[in-house]
Protein backbone atom coordinates (compact mmCIF):
# COMPACT_ATOMS: atom_id res chain seq x y z
CA UNK A 1 0.00 0.00 0.00
CA UNK A 2 1.36 3.41 -0.99
CA UNK A 3 0.26 6.60 0.75
CA UNK A 4 0.96 10.09 -0.55
CA UNK A 5 1.91 12.54 2.17
CA UNK A 6 1.97 16.32 1.69
CA UNK A 7 4.80 17.69 3.83
CA UNK A 8 4.19 21.30 4.83
CA UNK A 9 7.23 22.24 6.89
CA UNK A 10 6.09 25.80 7.40
CA UNK A 11 8.14 28.15 9.54
CA UNK A 12 10.36 28.30 12.60
CA UNK A 13 10.92 24.86 14.06
CA UNK A 14 8.68 23.29 11.40
CA UNK A 15 11.43 22.06 9.03
CA UNK A 16 13.36 20.49 11.90
CA UNK A 17 10.27 18.75 13.30
CA UNK A 18 9.22 17.49 9.85
CA UNK A 19 12.67 16.02 9.23
CA UNK A 20 12.31 13.92 12.39
CA UNK A 21 8.67 13.03 11.67
CA UNK A 22 9.67 11.69 8.25
CA UNK A 23 12.33 9.53 9.94
CA UNK A 24 9.59 8.01 12.10
CA UNK A 25 7.37 7.36 9.07
CA UNK A 26 10.31 5.78 7.25
CA UNK A 27 10.83 3.37 10.17
CA UNK A 28 7.12 2.50 10.09
CA UNK A 29 7.42 1.93 6.35
CA UNK A 30 10.34 -0.47 6.79
CA UNK A 31 8.44 -2.50 9.38
CA UNK A 32 5.10 -2.62 7.56
CA UNK A 33 3.52 -2.94 4.14
CA UNK A 34 2.84 0.79 3.96
CA UNK A 35 5.08 2.91 1.76
CA UNK A 36 5.08 6.70 1.80
CA UNK A 37 5.64 9.15 -1.04
CA UNK A 38 6.42 12.63 0.24
CA UNK A 39 5.61 15.86 -1.59
CA UNK A 40 6.93 19.05 0.00
CA UNK A 41 4.95 22.26 -0.32
CA UNK A 42 5.20 25.78 1.06
CA UNK A 43 2.91 27.31 3.68
CA UNK A 44 3.06 30.31 6.01
CA UNK A 45 5.88 32.85 6.03
CA UNK A 46 8.09 30.66 3.84
CA UNK A 47 5.32 30.67 1.21
CA UNK A 48 4.80 34.43 1.54
CA UNK A 49 8.52 35.05 1.12
CA UNK A 50 8.79 32.85 -2.00
CA UNK A 51 5.35 33.12 -3.59
CA UNK A 52 3.62 36.12 -2.00
CA UNK A 53 0.82 33.90 -0.65
CA UNK A 54 0.68 31.93 2.65
CA UNK A 55 -1.20 29.03 0.98
CA UNK A 56 -0.33 29.08 -2.74
CA UNK A 57 -2.20 27.18 -5.45
CA UNK A 58 0.52 24.55 -5.93
CA UNK A 59 0.36 23.79 -2.19
CA UNK A 60 -3.43 23.44 -2.49
CA UNK A 61 -2.98 21.00 -5.37
CA UNK A 62 -0.48 18.88 -3.44
CA UNK A 63 -2.70 18.83 -0.34
CA UNK A 64 -5.81 17.93 -2.33
CA UNK A 65 -4.08 15.01 -4.08
CA UNK A 66 -2.50 13.59 -0.89
CA UNK A 67 -3.78 10.96 1.50
CA UNK A 68 -2.56 12.94 4.50
CA UNK A 69 -0.85 16.21 5.40
CA UNK A 70 2.13 16.37 7.72
CA UNK A 71 2.16 19.91 9.07
CA UNK A 72 5.08 21.57 10.86
CA UNK A 73 4.65 25.03 12.35
CA UNK A 74 3.45 28.40 11.19
CA UNK A 75 4.34 31.96 12.10
CA UNK A 76 7.24 34.37 11.97
CA UNK A 77 8.28 37.13 14.40
CA UNK A 78 8.69 39.47 11.42
CA UNK A 79 4.90 39.38 11.02
CA UNK A 80 4.10 39.24 14.74
CA UNK A 81 5.76 42.61 15.22
CA UNK A 82 4.00 44.27 12.28
CA UNK A 83 0.36 44.99 13.15
CA UNK A 84 -0.13 46.60 9.73
CA UNK A 85 0.92 43.51 7.78
CA UNK A 86 -1.71 42.92 5.07
CA UNK A 87 -0.91 39.24 4.85
CA UNK A 88 0.19 36.97 7.69
CA UNK A 89 1.58 33.42 7.86
CA UNK A 90 -1.38 32.26 9.95
CA UNK A 91 -3.69 33.17 7.07
CA UNK A 92 -2.26 30.12 5.29
CA UNK A 93 -3.43 27.78 8.06
CA UNK A 94 -6.88 29.36 8.14
CA UNK A 95 -7.18 29.15 4.36
CA UNK A 96 -6.03 25.51 4.39
CA UNK A 97 -8.68 24.61 6.98
CA UNK A 98 -11.37 26.29 4.90
CA UNK A 99 -10.14 24.84 1.58
CA UNK A 100 -9.93 21.26 2.86
CA UNK A 101 -12.95 21.43 5.16
CA UNK A 102 -10.84 20.78 8.26
CA UNK A 103 -13.48 21.99 10.65
CA UNK A 104 -12.82 20.09 13.88
CA UNK A 105 -10.13 20.64 16.48
CA UNK A 106 -10.38 17.64 18.80
CA UNK A 107 -8.32 17.80 21.99
CA UNK A 108 -8.39 14.86 24.39
CA UNK A 109 -7.34 15.70 27.95
CA UNK A 110 -6.35 12.81 30.18
CA UNK A 111 -4.17 12.41 33.23
CA UNK A 112 -2.38 9.24 34.15
CA UNK A 113 -2.39 8.51 37.85
CA UNK A 114 1.22 7.32 37.72
CA UNK A 115 2.31 10.83 36.64
CA UNK A 116 0.16 12.98 38.94
CA UNK A 117 2.87 13.33 41.58
CA UNK A 118 5.04 15.17 39.03
CA UNK A 119 2.47 17.88 38.39
CA UNK A 120 2.46 21.25 40.18
CA UNK A 121 -1.36 20.98 40.41
CA UNK A 122 -3.11 19.37 43.36
CA UNK A 123 -3.67 15.62 43.12
CA UNK A 124 -7.40 15.94 43.83
CA UNK A 125 -7.78 18.21 40.79
CA UNK A 126 -5.91 15.90 38.44
CA UNK A 127 -7.06 12.48 39.52
CA UNK A 128 -9.09 10.69 36.83
CA UNK A 129 -9.27 13.68 34.46
CA UNK A 130 -10.52 12.37 31.12
CA UNK A 131 -12.45 14.59 28.70
CA UNK A 132 -12.39 15.80 25.11
CA UNK A 133 -12.71 19.38 23.87
CA UNK A 134 -14.22 20.01 20.42
CA UNK A 135 -13.78 23.33 18.64
CA UNK A 136 -15.10 24.42 15.26
CA UNK A 137 -12.34 25.84 13.03
CA UNK A 138 -13.88 27.22 9.86
CA UNK A 139 -16.19 29.88 11.27
CA UNK A 140 -16.29 32.20 14.23
CA UNK A 141 -13.70 34.68 15.39
CA UNK A 142 -10.98 33.48 12.99
CA UNK A 143 -13.01 34.52 9.97
CA UNK A 144 -14.99 37.45 11.36
CA UNK A 145 -14.77 40.97 10.03
CA UNK A 146 -12.46 43.26 11.96
CA UNK A 147 -12.06 46.97 11.75
CA UNK A 148 -12.38 50.46 13.14
CA UNK A 149 -15.24 52.84 12.46
CA UNK A 150 -14.61 55.81 10.18
CA UNK A 151 -14.59 58.21 13.12
CA UNK A 152 -12.16 55.98 15.07
CA UNK A 153 -14.48 55.70 18.08
CA UNK A 154 -15.46 52.06 17.64
CA UNK A 155 -13.67 48.85 16.90
CA UNK A 156 -15.28 45.58 15.95
CA UNK A 157 -14.32 41.94 15.64
CA UNK A 158 -17.28 39.79 14.66
CA UNK A 159 -17.88 36.16 15.51
CA UNK A 160 -20.28 34.50 13.09
CA UNK A 161 -21.13 30.81 12.70
CA UNK A 162 -23.40 29.24 10.11
CA UNK A 163 -26.04 26.83 11.37
CA UNK A 164 -24.35 24.05 9.36
CA UNK A 165 -21.00 24.71 11.09
CA UNK A 166 -22.58 24.40 14.54
CA UNK A 167 -24.53 21.28 13.53
CA UNK A 168 -21.55 19.35 12.17
CA UNK A 169 -19.23 20.03 15.15
CA UNK A 170 -22.11 19.26 17.56
CA UNK A 171 -22.87 16.01 15.73
CA UNK A 172 -19.20 14.99 15.99
CA UNK A 173 -19.04 15.86 19.70
CA UNK A 174 -22.34 14.15 20.55
CA UNK A 175 -21.27 10.96 18.77
CA UNK A 176 -18.00 10.96 20.70
CA UNK A 177 -19.90 11.54 23.95
CA UNK A 178 -22.00 8.44 23.27
CA UNK A 179 -18.78 6.40 23.07
CA UNK A 180 -17.52 7.94 26.33
CA UNK A 181 -20.47 7.26 28.65
CA UNK A 182 -21.95 10.63 27.64
CA UNK A 183 -18.90 12.56 28.91
CA UNK A 184 -16.92 15.03 26.83
State the predicted function of each range.
Residues 19-22, 75:
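Short, function-defining helix-loop hinge/capping sites that tune catalysis or transport
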Amino acid sequence: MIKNIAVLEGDGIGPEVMKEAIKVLDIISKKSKIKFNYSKALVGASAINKKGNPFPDDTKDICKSSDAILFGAIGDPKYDNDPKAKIRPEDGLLEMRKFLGLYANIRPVKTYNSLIEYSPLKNKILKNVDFVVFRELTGGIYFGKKGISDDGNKAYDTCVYKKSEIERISFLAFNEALKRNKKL
